[in-house]
Amino acid sequence: MSILTTTALASILDWLAANAPKAELASDSRRIAQGDVFVAYPGDEADGRSYIANAIERGAQAVIYEAAGCTWDAEWDVAHLAIDDLKEHAGEIAAAYYAHPDRSMFTVAITGTNGKTSCAQWLGSALSRLGQPTAVIGTLGVGIFTNGGHGSFDVTGYTTPDAVLLQRSLVNVSNLGATALAIEASSIGLHQGRLSGMHFDMALFTNFTRDHLDYHGDMAAYEEAKAMLFDWPGLQHAVINLDDAMGVRLVQRLQSRQADVGITGYTLSDKKIDGIAVLRATDIRSNQSGTVFQLESSAGNTQVKTQLVGQFNVSNVLGIIGILLAKGIALQDAVNAVEALTAVPGRMQQLGGGEAPLVVIDYAHTPDALEKTLATLRSVANDRGGELWCVFGCGGDRDPGKRPQMGKVSMAADHIVVTTDNPRNEEPANIIGDIVAGITAPKNAPQIIEDRASAILWAGRHAARQDVILLAGKGHEAYQEVKGRKLPFLDADHAALALSTRVMQGAS
């Protein structure tokens, strides 16, 4: 990815200062306010240049736009500047325009197929408990943690926001007092340059499994996109999961290319790599309420008692501890901070239990994530003396090749209910057919219930009180995307309804 020359960047900034002094930048015409500058370039789903007229109607006083393939309309009577490869350079331009707001913050980027959201939220909570108000930007939106808690999050609709919105968000959180930042760095966001213009003090890698092949094409391209984070200029330290093969490759890449970057590895096994610090979790014991493990590190050994369920969350917690220790936080202070962490909304979120089935809502939407989540909940179901249910679907217009893999993985459950996720522009029946093709030897015949609300209600009605029901795939999402519309839908609401219906019907 090319970088603008200093002269070219200065010229653009001078033009903005002359034509739109003190204006805000916006790349979404719907966010334009009177006096703003509209930044227009082709996006994933639409070409921003198609909305120039709309942006001007909403009050844009100037427009900068991608030059290639666009002829300025004489009726658009505002200042305008054509820029080559604008999408690629939007991050650099916006960062410089807003005077690099991230430079005053301790900044950590988190990448990996699964675990980004939990790790970003937990890092924000942990750092804020240690006295550093921390902004978090990711799948749940943009928010700030103080003293371990947070207010509402402003939803952006992306794991990693577009470059212009990202820089505006950084200005806002900086003005609100954030002195640290935890940001989810998606492979697509990295590949598209949404993070261009930022600095990262540290980077955290969680894991690498199949996802987004509809965008990247193959696993090699997907891996290379994620690896871009670890080539970042100025990176000081990398914290890497050694139990993942890509993690080992990243360590080797860093050692050969960027010897000045510090490395901390973490593992649930006995893995070792020369030349790096290693955090290790042993004697892991988990139940419905949380997990206890022994932490071995060069900073000392100690017991850690978390309120989180599952070995994959032990791995994520090790990643958080790795960042804290690399920052210079004392071991016991780091442990105290992670012991206070609780489940992120839509990530192993629990409802019911006791005299009702335990319903667990999780964003697991890849074969690997679903497999690990079911393995964790199998032990919980065994502890409760019950069976395990899996209610899930797959997203439309996204990597159809993973659907039968998801079906195959779901056979780890005793009862499978296949339903919709976000069908988008595909027919739900076709998506479900792809999933069911992978369910070759289920313990019980899978139930096919296309309507997700009905599927959740059905599982809640038929499960025994000691059973565990996993609602997988949508997690925190408050909508279901169908034919271009986002219809209100929250798994937690429908789970609560299913549980209350059991009470009214006197189910056992």
Swiss-Prot record:
Motif range (Meso-diaminopimelate recognition motif): 421-424
Protein residues bound to UDP-N-acetyl-alpha-D-muramoyl-L-alanyl-D-glutamate: S29, T159, T160, S186, Q192, R194
A biological process from GO: peptidoglycan biosynthetic process
Keywords from the UniProt entry: ATP-binding, Cell cycle, Cell division, Cell shape, Cell wall biogenesis/degradation, Cytoplasm, Ligase, Magnesium, Nucleotide-binding, Peptidoglycan synthesis
Binding site for ATP: G112, T113, N114, G115, K116, T117, S118
Protein family: Belongs to the MurCDEF family. MurE subfamily.
Pfam family, one: Mur_ligase_C
Pathway of action: Cell wall biogenesis; peptidoglycan biosynthesis
Gene designation per UniProt: murE
Catalytic activity: UDP-N-acetyl-alpha-D-muramoyl-L-alanyl-D-glutamate + meso-2,6-diaminopimelate + ATP = UDP-N-acetyl-alpha-D-muramoyl-L-alanyl-gamma-D-glutamyl-meso-2,6-diaminopimelate + ADP + phosphate + H(+)
Role played: Catalyzes the addition of meso-diaminopimelic acid to the nucleotide precursor UDP-N-acetylmuramoyl-L-alanyl-D-glutamate (UMAG) in the biosynthesis of bacterial cell-wall peptidoglycan.
Residues that hold meso-2,6-diaminopimelate according to the record: R398, D421, N422, P423, R424, G473, E477
EC number: 6.3.2.13
Domain of life: Bacteria
Organism: Janthinobacterium sp. (strain Marseille) (Minibacterium massiliensis)
Modified residues (N6-carboxylysine): K226
InterPro entries on file: Mur-like_cat_sf, Mur_ligase_C, Mur_ligase_C_dom_sf, Mur_ligase_cen, Mur_ligase_N, MurE/MurF_N, UDP-N-AcMur-Glu-dNH2Pim_ligase
Gene3D superfamilies assigned to the protein according to its UniProt record, in alphabetical order: Mur ligase, C-terminal domain, Mur-like, catalytic domain, MurE/MurF, N-terminal domain
Enzyme class (EC, first level): ligase
Cofactor(s) named in the record: Mg(2+)
UniProt-recorded name of the protein: UDP-N-acetylmuramoyl-L-alanyl-D-glutamate--2,6-diaminopimelate ligase
